[in-house]
Amino acid sequence: MGVPERPTLLLLLSLLLLPLGLPVLCAPPRLICDGRVLERYILEAREAENVTMGCAEGPRLSENITVPDTKVNFNAWKRMEVQEQAVEVWQGLSLLSEAILRGQALLANSSQPSGMLQLHIDKAISGLRSLTSLLRVLGAQKESISPPDATPPAPLRTLMVENFCKLFRVYSNFLRGKLKLYTGEACRRGDR
């Protein structure tokens, strides 16, 4: 019953600090660069999209929610600096997180049956938090902060969704598109 061993103490400390988004000593710094990690989140997003796919008319949101536009002009994307890509991905991920949380609140206040839908919302929230932490370790948050004398980034393009089907489609498309493109490029360049 003495003092815990040092590795155990470090593990406990890292588990406490990880949700805060602080750098953790034990966390593999380039975990997001392992394609299997991102593919797991993409698979969860696709499952949520598929569950709600037959829902052109429902389950509806009681208000429209703003989400990031997921369209990618590949030629323009390739010409962008990694810092510009980081800004777009970081802003998009933040807006998407807000949108999913808003969807969760609207579902909780509705009379719609929510069992399976709530499960996928909870998975999406957990996945977005994990992806945010992994992007922080990769340095996306630092890259998305422009110096005071820099030209401000272009405003994030957005669109409105009115049902959970479209919300999960945007979530899935964002992960498969901009997030995957950014992490692939940042990992290839070795940016941190």
Curated annotation (Swiss-Prot):
Cystine pairs: C33-C187
Single biological process term from Gene Ontology: erythrocyte maturation
GO cellular component, one term: extracellular space
Signal peptide: 1-26
Glycosylation sites: N50, N64, N109
Pfam families named in the record: EPO_TPO
InterPro entries attached to this UniProt entry: 4_helix_cytokine-like_core (IPR009079), EPO/TPO_CS (IPR019767), EPO_TPO (IPR001323), Erythroptn (IPR003013)
Keywords attached to this entry: Disulfide bond, Erythrocyte maturation, Glycoprotein, Hormone, Secreted, Signal
Domain of life: Eukaryota
Tissue: Produced by kidney or liver of adult mammals and by liver of fetal or neonatal mammals.
Keyword Ribosomal protein: no
Subcellular location: Secreted
GO MF, one annotated term: erythropoietin receptor binding
Family membership: Belongs to the EPO/TPO family.
PANTHER family from the UniProt entry: ERYTHROPOIETIN (PTHR10370:SF0)
Role noted for this protein: Hormone involved in the regulation of erythrocyte proliferation and differentiation and the maintenance of a physiological level of circulating erythrocyte mass. Binds to EPOR leading to EPOR dimerization and JAK2 activation thereby activating specific downstream effectors, including STAT1 and STAT3.
Protein name: Erythropoietin
Organism of this sequence: Alexandromys oeconomus (Tundra vole)
